[in-house]
Regions:
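Short, conserved, surface-exposed binding loops centered on an aromatic residue
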Residues: 12, 57-61, 110-113
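Generic hydrophobic, aliphatic-rich segments that mediate packing or membrane embedding
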Residues: 16-18, 28, 32
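Hydrophobic, well-structured mid-protein blocks that either form specific transmembrane helices
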Residues: 36-76
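Short, charge-patterned binding micro-sites
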Residues: 1-23, 52-57
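Short amphipathic alpha-helices in soluble, non-transmembrane regions
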Residues: 30-40, 77-86, 134-138
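Core RNA-modification/binding signature centered on pseudouridine synthases
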Residues: 2-6, 86-175
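Short beta-strand-to-loop capping motifs
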Residues: 21-28, 69-74, 120-126
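A generic structural signal for short beta-strands and their flanking turns/coil linkers
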Residues: 16-20, 63-65, 89
């Protein structure tokens, strides 16, 4: 059996939308789900199991993620946040060649704020806006005091014909 998990998040970020691809000869989805959940580590239980006609390659196809960032101060800078992707927004990026400033505004697809916090749709996958580093930058720039435990990934998306499609819907198209 071969299990491929979706790309990992930083330690401390909760997720409601993780996906795995399992290559197995087992042909009973419900039976596999029960066996898997009985053997997997706590917190990695599966809620769905589907047999697809082709290999979904979810980890390679995911290009965006939705996040909720709990923060009651975000509403105070709602207008600033909701326009953050309309002009350059620079963050420090560390790479093998050193540290440099990068404009991450093209990686922010949508951002909204209300009294509960921030809703962020951003690049994820091969081109990635790391949510942990983005929240660090928000803390520095706007004094929001966001902790990693305040961040929850709500969904993941693939590109299908130039449109974002939820991974669950993408999988249903492969059944």
């Amino acid at each position: 059996m071969l299990i491929n998990m979706s790309q990992p998040l930083s330690l401390g970020i909760e997720s409601l939308a993780e996906w795995a691809t399992v290559q197995t000869s087992y042909d009973d989805p419900q039976g596999f789900l029960e066996l898997y959940n009985n053997c997997c580590p706590q917190g990695l239980e599966a809620s769905q199991c589907h047999i697809t006609q082709t290999k979904p390659n979810i980890a390679g196809k995911v290009i965006a993620s939705d996040y909720f960032i709990k923060n009651d101060k975000a509403v105070e800078i709602k207008e600033i946040l909701e326009n953050i992707n309309k002009k350059p927004f620079f963050m420090e990026v560390k790479s093998k060649s050193g540290v440099y400033e990068k404009d991450v505004s093209p990686l922010i697809y949508r951002i909204k704020a209300d009294a509960d916090g921030i809703y962020l749709l951003s690049a994820f996958g091969n081109t990635n806006l790391r949510c942990d580093r983005f929240t660090e930058k928000l803390n520095q720039a706007f004094n929001l005091d966001i902790k990693l435990r305040d961040v929850t990934r709500l969904n993941q998306y693939v590109d299908q014909n130039g449109e974002l499609k939820e991974v669950g819907e993408y999988i249903k198209g492969l059944l």
